[in-house]
Amino acid sequence: MQGQKRRVRTCHSCYTRKQKASESDSICDRQYPCNHCTRRRRPEECVYGPPPVKVPSCPPVPADQSETQPRPVESARPTRETPVDDSEAHWSREHSALARSFGYFEDSNSNTMALLRRLELPDQSDTELKNAWPSTWETIHHELDLMPERQIIDFLVQYFVYELNWMKQVIHVPSFLANYQLWWAKDKIVEIADVEFAALIARICSYATQFLPSPSHTVDQIRGRSLADIRDTCSNIGNKLATACETLDWKGTLVRVQHIIFAALKVSCEGRTSQFWEGIGSACRAAQKAGIHTDTTGLESQLAKDSAQELERDVQRRTFCSLYVLDSHLSRQLDRIPFLSNHLIEETLPRLRLIPDIGNIPTETATRAPDIFTERLMQVQLGLFWRGLGLQRTCEFDPTESERIYEKFNSEYLNNLHPAFAIAHPDTTLDKALPKLPMQRQLLYIAIFDSICWNFRPLLLLKPDQVASLAPYKKVLLRSQKRRLGMAALKVLEAVAALHTMFGGSYTRFSAIIFNSFEPAILLLNLCSHADFPFDQDDNSTSLVGTKVRMTYRIAMQAVEQAIHRLQMLADLSDMAASGARVATLLFARSVQPKQSSSPPALTLSVSGSLGPSQFPTPIERYGEQENWPSLEAGDPYSMPDNFPSMAQDSFPSPQLSSLKFPVVWGEAFF
């Protein structure tokens, strides 16, 4: 029977290697990752749905009890023992009490703490911390016992690894999965590092539920437990564990930075951008307290030539880069002051090129293939470019200066993009081998064209008397820049439409899709209200950063209409989408009505309530049919079809030190 599914008793990797559970000498232990995938140092290849366990399923949580304390789950983890003494937990750091009181960075080479280290004074005891120790560990054990059962956590972690991590690249998947299995293997939790990792797991799971249901998982529950219940439980556990960790260890580590970022990303998915900004600020402060922004931490003083240590240090650099991208992008969009300075990121750029394992292709092609982190590096350089200009938005808009910056952007940034991310003719050779590469490409395009919009947006705020006072050549320049602004907004919406299609064209809480559906729509509506806007005539088109863009009133309003449709569809999931849809619809009505009364039927659109279906071919159609989503759970969530598709792989690579001296990261040698 076509579509018949059967239960699989091993992970997909073991199944293909015929290491079935029936073979007594080579048993797949069915954990995530399993013993064989861990031994092969390929934990990211471990893909399967765990079988049902005979435990009573939790009934859906009533709406009036959604905020109540969740019940403990017997199969979450074994009971942990309370640590016997302080030395077991390894929480004491040299002069931690002094650093906590004065706020010193403990790994500094120039502050007073550096002098005290040279004097070799005895450790300072923290009375407040000692008094809080027993009760804090009681809280930790209580929260750990409330974690959802492992099968649920395994599913969410697997979904995150294969479907979500490509977006922000906060963690390095192979090393995370290796630590994930080690964490589950522990008999008891007695170290703060393990509690921090538990907070990371909980917050990753809470974040992952924001993207469910999805085309690969169409139901709103996992193993009989509602997604809302799982989300609230994991969020509460993550928050309480994070608070406990900060109480026990003021300094923190990389893992703390990571789980704070995931907490911020979760509120971003909920449409609370102001809290997202505050969360990024908290992560930036945590990163500096932990010292991951420097190369003078304990890791660097150890065996510098050891590849494992160097990889671990590079993971820190990558997380810091991801944080810088979020900080730069948000500060530019929201007109805020960034938390991280440029010199910090220039000193901590990744030094390893991790070659992806993409199957049977020539070695030469593989070495030119983009790393999974290449898109983030493009985003880092984008932030460095715009922030390096030191622009002051308080100054009056100068068309000449904006034109100079635009030309510089073309020559210094766009001309140095990796071929797979080129604007005009990207190299799509490896799109099938790297399934997330097309999505990363659209994500970068959104950021690039949004930054061009940011460069020219102030021209819309010029008053008539300011425009009248401009020199004639500046008026001509201003007219062409209006056109560029409109074309850039169109390109943002085109990239958003393509990315949304790759997500299945369905409901999503991904803030990049929501935010960047709203902003360019507002820009286009504003531009279309200008009587002197230089629209293209007939079949003419204009070049923008090497690509031809046709800019007419009809095309612009059609793109806006589609953006509003998208916002209306996502309004049920996001307050940001709902409020954006309301404002955009009102502006749309205001823009369309004068045109309808003064011209033949250019657009016949409904602007009250729903806008109705689009009457013109959509930009989405040029991208073809919706991609097939690799199924993690469909029908029977713990069975697997015979023709299980191969998943995207970010395998344990062989680290290679870049021969380039930083901050230069461009060129064939790096990629």
Curated annotation (Swiss-Prot):
InterPro entries: Sec_Metabolite_Reg, Transcription_factor_dom_fun. Residues 148-593 are annotated as: Fungal transcription factor domain. The keyword Membrane does not apply. Residues 49-62 have a biased composition (Pro residues). The keyword Zinc applies. Residues 77-90 have a biased composition (Basic and acidic residues). One of its GO terms (cellular component) is nucleus. Residues 48-90, 629-650 are annotated as: Disordered. Residues 11-46 bind DNA. Keywords: DNA-binding, Metal-binding, Nucleus, Transcription, Transcription regulation, Zinc. GO terms for molecular function: DNA binding; zinc ion binding. Transmembrane segments: none annotated. Transcription factor; part of the gene cluster that mediates the biosynthesis of the 6-methyl-2-pyrone derivative xylariolide D. May play a role in the regulation of the expression of the highly reducing polyketide synthase xilA and the cytochroe P450 monooxygenase xilC. PANTHER family: COL-21, UNCHARACTERIZED TRANSCRIPTIONAL REGULATORY PROTEIN. This is Transcription factor xilB. It comes from Penicillium rubens (strain ATCC 28089 / DSM 1075 / NRRL 1951 / Wisconsin 54-1255) (Penicillium chrysogenum).
